[in-house]
Amino acid sequence: MSYKRLNSDLIDLIELRNELHAMAFNDPQYDDLEDDLHDYEDTFNRRYQGIIAPILIRIHKKLAPEIPHLIPTAYVANHYEYLAETDTYETDGTSGVVLENGAGNNFRLTFVPNPTRLLLTSSKDMQVVWSENQPDDETK
């Protein structure tokens, strides 16, 4: 598995989502960009479903076994902030897939690039539950 390619494709997807997020609905280019984004999401899901699904299954099984895993793009936030000085992306933690545990706590699971990783966020905490730097580790 080329995590370098996954990271690059994730960044391309994020850039498309950011571009659409910044565009007004009445912009003449909005519909075309939205179509391009959906096409890219379909390609991303086809390309990475078989690779990412086992990771997501492990995470869901450990953190929220009653909630089935979704397609990879469901875990990509709608908007990211790019920080050029560190070449990283941040999200505000309000996007991604919601996981609820039995104690009534809500968490969100979100993909972030550079390096590719899955973040588990709550209103109080954020932790990396999977990273390309430690791909075979058990879910934390």
Name each region found by the language model.
Residues 9-23, 40, 47:
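Non-transmembrane amphipathic alpha-helical segments
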Residues 88-140:
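Charged, polyampholytic interaction/assembly segments that form long, compositionally biased interfaces
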Residues 22, 76-81, 117-119:
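N-terminal processing/targeting junctions
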Residues 1-10:
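Short, charge/polar-rich alpha-helical segments
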Residues 30-39:
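Short, charged, amphipathic alpha-helical segments
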Residues 38-108:
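Long, charge-patterned amphipathic interaction tracts in eukaryotic proteins
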